[in-house]
Design a protein with these regions (language model features):
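Hinge/lid segment of periplasmic solute-binding proteins
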Residues: 47-53, 117-168, 221, 225, ...
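Extracytoplasmic "Venus flytrap"/periplasmic binding protein-like
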Residues: 78-143, 155, 171-177, 184, ...
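Short, solvent-exposed loop/beta-turn-alpha elements that line the ligand-binding surface or hinge
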Residues: 131-145, 208-209, 213-216, 231-256, ...
């Protein structure tokens, strides 16, 4: 079965169940990068869909994904060359999107195109979202399940489907005497990782797992993506899709996998506070670690190992039935058009979006340069081999893990969990502190979120607060 279609159906089912959430992040910690395309109009013979050029406005896209910044800059330039419409792409630094968005939206030249990470993010920004009902880009979606709505209004649409798990180096795993078939659950993973760690000098590695960096370029992998697993299993057990009071039923399992990550690692756990996403990439690509938790978006970082040398495992945490678990698949990337922009800029932005998802240039860039699976009718199959691996799990009947982290109450909650994980790893905090940050912090932030929403309903809404 086609990877694009398979993963699209997987995400559609997840969204229909109300369990959709997000991905993100990058190893980049640089300041925001800006590029504006202002070249004169030129004809394009490669486009399968002719771009609309009636709009007199301009486009300003505040991009969430640093790892795709260069590809978006190039695509913006191509669009300007074809249409003459100026397109500016600004990419927020890793972990700074919400803060950057609030700052940019207060400017006279605010973004005409921005994004939210799912229902929680939408709750903050829905008053700024143009109703996309009847727009060309909305009509290009393969399923209505890829849209977020506020009542009947289509406030945002998903533009990429992504998958994450534990990426591994096949060559190194084989050299250690194992294959993917030897790892069917947490106990197997721990046995293999412990053995690799014990034999690291013999195998020529520094550890089984790359460093679990907890600086801002990497901590999202653990305070958000790894934390998704205990949330997913709790929601699944309780038959719910969100909650204002997480119980922490599977936090002992969260501890198991975190302990494994920081013990069978390339570095002392006390050093994790300063370890970065780039450190983990260097360790993995440098063949100093066998396992690396990340997702399909990281392909460009690890492709030098060779497509045939890359594998991906589910993130096992010791939950019952996890032998049938697949990878974590979903989206946290939803386009929103700023309804406070001028009519000309709104039309220019809608035209640009439609061109991105229908033209040969746009769909090729998103599939090949960005490595995306996109939920649009004209989508091209991605050449990203990690996506093919994700498709194999689905074809084998494995159950994909829903992205439940869009239901996390706030960025403040994530930061609290991240700080507690870091202190625990360093030996300056206890696991009870992690549980407190996870459970009590969830309830506290859920109350704050509700109070802010009530304030907005009462007419005191200003710029959203994080």
């Amino acid at each position: 079965m086609n990877a694009k279609k398979t993963l699209s159906m997987t995400l559609a089912a997840a969204m229909a169940a109300g369990l959709l959430a997000g991905c993100g992040g990058s190893s980049s910690t640089a300041a925001s990068s800006t590029s504006t395309s202002t070249e004169s109009k030129a004809e394009s013979t490669a486009a399968s869909t002719e771009a609309t050029t009636d709009a007199a406005g301009k486009v300003y896209y505040l991009n969430f994904k640093p790892e795709q910044d260069e590809a978006w800059q190039n695509l913006a330039k191509k669009y300007t060359e074809e249409t003459g419409v100026p397109v500016t792409v600004v990419t927020a630094a890793s972990g700074q999107y919400e803060t950057t968005l609030m700052s940019e939206m207060e400017k006279s030249e605010a973004p005409t195109l921005f994004q939210v990470n799912g229902p929680v993010g939408l709750a903050n920004w829905k008053d700024y979202c143009l109703d996309l009902s009847g727009s060309d880009v909305y009509g290009q979606l393969t399923s209505d399940s890829f849209a977020l709505k506020d009542g009947d209004a289509v406030t945002s649409i998903a533009y990429v489907i992504e998958t994450y798990g534990i990426i591994y180096n096949k060559e190194l795993l084989t050299a250690a005497g194992y294959t993917q078939d030897d790892i069917k659950g947490f106990d197997d993973l721990k046995k293999v990782a412990d053995d690799i760690q014990a034999r690291k000098a013999e195998l020529g590695v520094d550890g089984a797992f790359t460093s679990a960096g907890m600086d801002g370029s990497s901590d999202w992998r653990f305070k958000t993506h790894l934390a998704n697993l205990p949330i997913y299993y709790e929601y699944k057990a309780d038959g719910i899709g969100s909650t204002d009071a997480i119980k922490g039923t599977y936090l002992d399992n969260y501890k198991k996998i975190w302990d494994l990550y920081i013990t069978d690692s390339t570095c002392d756990p006390k050093l994790l506070a300063s370890k970065t996403g780039n450190d983990a990439v260097a360790e993995f690509v440098g063949k100093k670690a066998v396992f690396y938790q990340n997702g399909t978006w990281a392909y460009s970082d690890v492709k030098d190992l060779g497509d045939d040398n890359l594998g991906m495992l589910p993130i096992y945490i010791g939950a019952e039935g996890e032998e049938n678990q697949g990878l974590c698949t979903g989206s946290e990337n939803f386009w929103c058009v700023n309804n406070t922009s001028s009519d000309e800029d709104i039309q220019a932005t809608l035209d640009f979006l439609n061109w991105c998802v229908t033209s040969d240039e746009g769909t090729s860039a998103m599939a090949d340069d960005m490595g995306f699976v996109i939920p649009f009718k004209a989508a091209k199959d991605s050449t990203n081999p990690l996506i093919a691996i994700a498709n194999d799990y689905v074809a084998e009947g494995k159950t994909s893990v829903d992205w439940c982290f869009s239901t996390m109450p706030s960025e403040e909650w994530k930061n609290g969990v991240g700080s507690a994980l870091t202190a625990y790893a360093a030996g300056t905090g206890s696991w009870d502190d992690v549980v407190t940050a996870f459970v009590d912090g969830w309830a506290r932030n859920a109350r704050l979120k509700q109070a802010r929403q009530e304030d907005r309903k009462g007419g005191s809404a200003g710029m959203p607060r994080p």
